[in-house]
Amino acid sequence: MGTVLSYYYSVERGGTTERQEWLVVPHRLELTAGGTSYRVYDHWSDLPEDSFLYSSAVSDCLMEARLSVPPVTRFVRTVRIRVRAPQLRKGQRLCVVGQQPALGQWKMERAVPMTEHAVGEWMADIDVSRLYGSQMELKFVAVEGNDFSKSLWESGDNRTVTLPLMSDGEVVVYDLTEVFLPLAPLRVAGTLVPVFSLRSKSSFGVGDFGDLKKMIDWVALTRQCVLQVLPINDTTQTHTWTDSYPYSCISIFAIHPQYVDLSALPPLADKKARIAYEQLRSELNDLPQIDYERVQEAKTGYLRMLFAQDGERVMATKAYQQFFQENERWLVPYAQYCSLRDRYGSADFSTWPAHHQWDEHDRKSLSTPGTKAYGEVAFFYYVQYLLFSQMSEAHAYARQKNVILKGDIPIGVSRYGCDVWMEPRYFNLNGQAGAPPDDFSVNGQNWGLPTYNWEEMLRDGCQWWVRRFQSMASFFDAYRIDHVLGFFRIWEIPIHSVHGLLGQFQPALALTREEIEGYGLHWQEELFTTPFITDWVLDRVFHEKAAFVRDHFLERKTDYYYRMKEAFDTQRKVEAFFAALVADDGQRRDFFGKETTVQDAENLRDGLYALISDVLFVRDHRDPNRFHPRICVQLDFVYESLYDSDKAFFNRLYDDYFYRRNNQYWYGEAMRKLPRLVEATRMLVCAEDLGMVPSCVPWVLDALRILSLEVQSMPKDPADEFGHTDRFPHRSVCTFSSHDMPTLRQWWDEDWDRTQHYYQTMLHRA
């Protein structure tokens, strides 16, 4: 096919890139015209408004774009016309027609057919010897197959191309602006469902990749176009039901073994085992809910037997060898991590007798068949190969059915996962990621995940994220960025906290003492930054148990104030103390010489949590001389104790800090990270932009053409009871509820008054 040049332009100053073109669809030049020299008239290509049309979700799934190699031409002198036309729909092709004989003299049946040589970009070579004069007038026309009666001409004046003086053997390339064809609004429907919930008769107690193909059939049958699933990454830490949370993965690459379709694998040679597993499969499928632990044990046992039976043959195939070569970077550490996790009975690598961190020197022995190390990890290679093969097959099947498979990228990873074990420099392990309080969680959310060391990640161009996105593109054509706000700032909670109230945004512009006093609030560090505990607070929180709490958990600080005893001065210490007391086994517990119920113990524990978080300001995690207003402190006792004038001063400070002070800063932080990531693949990018959303978030999503998430039952405008779909932006995902909210059917039965109001005002039914 000859040489192909793929390139882009950038503006450099002092060795630093100040600006560069859109990288997802770079310029492309095939040297197929047989010339001895090429002269190219390019134009700068910024991120287009309709960039979603270039995504694999649209071009490869919906439109079934078929790229072709341009035909080889042998003209003495050649003019190449190159233009982008992402608006074309399935079955359409592009032609160029004009006043010159070589362009058909405005007759469609003589128009020059063009070749789609890159995504959304078409080209045609023109023989200069058939041109007269130094100008060409032309237009581009979209044609339905070979039916010229269904031609759509671009609007506007004729395009004019002025030819330069050309020598024999020269090829002149004109890169023209996008075709002027109408952009039909693209609206598609879809379904969101976890793979694990897709149980069918062929399942083994849990939904698998075989069931995913059945779901793809249903989506296509109902004329939907998108099937979104929850994360499918491996989350195995303890081999118990606590591993079932899909947003705490141990590897951003590895797939969870529960999703393997056993029915698509060779049968077990052991007849007795085969019959036993078939009976177990039937039993697990009949359960009303997934028995996570039994399913895991059964599938792992089955795969171990199949590996012993068939593993050596499979791992000798070219397909496996290619898989291993393409994924070796992450696969080898992952397999060793899994082996060590199972050997030591814990995913907490800090407690392992050895191998506290991945050692690159181990790679060779772990990758060489016949070594002892290889024998310990080969099973995990084998399982991941099966999973990757089946998921790749499901992805190809979805494309055949014109269905977009949409994945989900969790914002965090497990603190005790392989990613942290392998590359700890990318993570901050002295804090916990979470979310501020909202309508669903008054104490905020503490996910327990480590936060990212963004400075370290940016040092190598966010390659950790780029590799993550590129791996995901093997299986999906669209993805949801879970908690996209984390790329602006993350809610970082101290490691000693259970709830999220003592968190702070990181990064953020914390306040100095002088800045706080600038709002009119006299700075009192001891009063504002330590738990506000008085007798009236204790009476309000604990009622008749106030004296008991004073005697056992507190000590006097002054005549008026108390402080927590050292043994209980953090929420984690309180949690550990009460852990045995609140074990829900129906037994009463001895509690400082008195019996107590589980409920009473939980109430005391939660009250102590509340005391510890009752502060007006939180000290910055990195600079002890700077402070953050504590989130939602207006509902707490320390705020209640302020004079009315001080409350007004504090409220002004609070609103400025959370809603104005950091906006431009957070915008800059997001723009340092997200552009690199959204350009890493051609997947369609969708954001989950819910929660405490600063005003800079829409700026970034719009600038990068990222789809927002609009939940009709939880509108972003607080003045609306329900979201109005006609007001949602075109670049958005519209849904009635998200994966962590009740489904439409469940919501319909929760509150009949609200349901009736929705029925009347949104559906316009009497």
What residue spans do the PLM features occupy?
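N-terminal nucleotide-handling cores and adjacent loading/scaffold lobes of large enzymes
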Residues: 41-44, 51
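Catalytic "initiation/cleavage/transfer" segments centered on a nucleophilic residue
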Residues: 36
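Aromatic/hydrophobic beta-strand junction motif of beta-rich domains
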Residues: 81-85
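Catalytic cores of glycan-processing enzymes that make or break glycosidic bonds
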Residues: 50-76, 80, 127-130, 161-766
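Aromatic-rich carbohydrate-binding modules that target alpha-glucans
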Residues: 1-4, 10-33, 87-135, 143-166, ...
